[in-house]
A protein has these predicted regions:
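Short, small-residue-biased leader/transition segments that mark boundaries at the very start
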Residues: 3-5
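Alpha-helical transmembrane segments of polytopic membrane transporters and translocases
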Residues: 30-52, 84-85
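Interfacial segments at transmembrane-helix termini and the short loops linking adjacent helices
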Residues: 31, 96-126
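Interfacial transmembrane-helix starts/ends
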Residues: 38, 71-88, 92-100, 115-118
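Helix-loop junctions and terminal segments of transmembrane helices
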Residues: 46-69
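Membrane-interface junctions at transmembrane-helix termini in multi-pass inner-membrane proteins
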Residues: 123-153
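Membrane-interface helix-loop junctions in multi-pass transport and translocation proteins
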Residues: 145, 155-192, 218, 222-240
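Membrane-proximal transmembrane or re-entrant/amphipathic helices at the cytosolic face
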Residues: 221-272
Length: 272
């Protein structure tokens, strides 16, 4: 797994700057563009997926124990809960980073120039989260080699995507989408493998999470525009308003029931 991560990073370092130069950028411009992706956008992606990495790590022994006892109902329950939690965290993070990419760039880095790289890296939060959690499920079921094989296939897809998409038309956005394709292919292959082992997920719940996140994104944009959109205060206020609207929408759409709300540290005090 560590080897795969190093290979993925090596593809970016070895190919992306060269592809940007081939597309017509100067060495200085290509270096700056790559810096926006690797030095500004990708750290945000990794930071946003820390909770899902922890979730995936805790999932392995839990699923492994149920698998050893041949308790498939418990495995399915844990897998469905983990997938739901993953989407609850990563889908709004992806939407928020997409719609507020430029303001986030200004807030954190003092420049709007990383906005494009941040925006087009946003889907990778959700896709990497899915990859992490599904990998944890498969490893817990004893299929340790399968996630690594799927990761290698994802890296191969990324290699092709970097060569095809990092060009004059797409620029650094193409390199960001190559990473999205990498995580997306790996996550999809993991999900297909889980389906072959009769693990099912509640896609209706996931669709509701996406709907809530979409409304949240609209709230973020509207609040940011109403407050002028140029200040750090406007960005922070937009994030807060978006977060509040998302939390309100989840129970209204039936994504979280009263019992699940009690388990959330932030709101459980209101559901005693």
């Amino acid at each position: 797994s560590e080897m795969c991560i190093r290979d993925r990073s090596s593809i970016d370092v070895l190919l992306v700057p060269g592809r940007l130069i081939d597309s017509g950028l100067s060495v200085e411009q290509a270096t700056a563009q790559f810096g926006y992706l690797a030095g500004m956008a990708q750290p945000l992606l990794l930071m946003a997926t820390i909770p899902t990495m922890s979730l995936a790590t805790s999932l392995v022994p839990a699923v492994s124990e149920a698998f050893a006892l041949n308790k498939w109902q418990i495995i399915e329950q844990k897998a469905a809960t983990a997938m739901k939690l993953c989407c609850l965290i990563t889908v709004p993070a992806s939407v928020g980073m997409w719609v507020l990419a430029e303001p986030i760039s200004c807030l954190l880095y003092g420049t709007a120039k990383a906005g494009v790289a941040i925006m087009h890296s946003a889907p990778a939060i959700c896709l990497l989260g899915l990859q992490q959690v599904t990998t944890g499920m498969l490893q817990g079921m004893g299929h340790t080699n399968l996630p690594m094989l799927n990761m290698l296939i994802g890296i191969a897809a990324k290699l092709v995507a970097v060569l095809r998409l990092t060009n004059a038309e797409y620029g650094i956005a193409g390199a960001a989408w190559a990473t999205n394709i990498n995580f997306g292919v790996t996550a999809l292959l993991n999900i297909i493998a889980l389906y072959k082992f009769s693990i099912r997920f509640s896609w209706l719940s996931i669709a509701k999470i996406i709907a809530a996140a979409a409304v949240m994104g609209a709230v973020a944009v509207e609040v940011h525009m109403l407050l002028g959109g140029a200040s750090a205060l406007a960005t922070i206020a937009a994030m807060l308003a978006a977060g509040i609207s998302y939390i309100i929408l989840l129970p209204l759409l039936g994504v979280l029931n009263r019992q699940e709300l009690r388990q959330l540290p932030v709101v459980k005090r209101f559901f005693k």
